[in-house]
């Protein structure tokens, strides 16, 4: 069968790489893909943008694609799933209505409140003055979020009132996030440890994926501004068996049932960003209507199941007949980024030292890369590579991932040096 993966990031390289391992699959197309997917023998890039839904549909129909897997959020919010389904094509992802869980933070907070799903106390605002009055009433630390899609960067954790007020002005008056910031959510600052809890949903059944933990801040020890994610590891020891059960009972099931009851039946990957307090009680920080990036990369390295088989089962509402199998080892991925990210950065730098053949127990997933006219791999984004490795402990996986990137370099590249530090502290204690 033929599979189409929509997207061009590290997440899509990992999903396409995994899909190509399925015995059911003869070809995996990636639209538009990157240099990493271009260089994989089993993958084929297609020059179609992720939100060019008419062109994606034409391609899928002409090539007789048997299954489409959607990586990023933008085409989901624009209704790619609705369009493909209307044409009778199998596609794994939520409809535009269901994708509001990521597309609008205000929608999500109101949904969580209606269904009594644990989350931070909050209020929505479209005007500067009422927002500032609320800030003064609540004090800092406090969290300000742009309502719409902002590539994972539309969240400001303000430790002082001045910082919070500046964020409100930037978003509501200063157009810092364009349309995404015309409405904001202000919510209480939650203390605890974060985890990424990702499941597959087929409308009524749920299959949990391996747990993981992302590193949102750009600097070591979680300093500096938020990014799309600087590295991740799996599994996340903070998600104990008890926390896992509470998350399923208090968050995942009520969300899936609540969406169905409101006429937005959810199919696709559902990612709950959790904050887990010292007592092991999870609260929802955010929902994403797709797999996380960079969490996908370490999770796919651990996945032993057939991803395509699982997606097909989900498209037929048969996830209850499936289980997922995982490598017992831990995996860890470190993002190599372009200097200046998450602010302004340069593109077009030649990347040197990429491994020429597959590495046992490791993988360099490409994100912001492309093939230049002379076939050299050059940078083409802020997050450029995710260097990922397996290990018997998170500490060993970390050591192997950093060793794998020793020879890889380009002008002005950087990475965090402490990915996995929370899990490693736990292992050492």
UniProtKB/Swiss-Prot annotation:
One of its GO terms (molecular function) is ATP hydrolysis activity. PROSITE patterns: ATP_GRASP, GARS. One of its GO terms (biological process) is purine nucleobase biosynthetic process. Residues 213-223 have a biased composition (Basic and acidic residues). Keywords: ATP-binding, Ligase, Magnesium, Manganese, Metal-binding, Nucleotide-binding, Purine biosynthesis. InterPro entries: ATP-grasp, ATP_grasp_subdomain_1, PreATP-grasp_dom_sf, PRibGlycinamid_synth_ATP-grasp, PRibGlycinamide_synth, PRibGlycinamide_synth_C-dom, PRibGlycinamide_synth_C_sf, PRibGlycinamide_synth_CS. The keyword NAD does not apply. The keyword Manganese applies. It catalyses: 5-phospho-beta-D-ribosylamine + glycine + ATP = N(1)-(5-phospho-beta-D-ribosyl)glycinamide + ADP + phosphate + H(+). Catalyzes the reversible conversion of phosphoribosylamine to glycinamide ribonucleotide, an enzymatic step in purine biosynthesis pathway. PANTHER family: PHOSPHORIBOSYLAMINE--GLYCINE LIGASE, PHOSPHORIBOSYLAMINE--GLYCINE LIGASE, CHLOROPLASTIC. This is Phosphoribosylamine--glycine ligase. It comes from Escherichia coli (strain K12). The lineage of its organism: Bacteria, Pseudomonadati, Pseudomonadota, Gammaproteobacteria, Enterobacterales. The gene is purD.
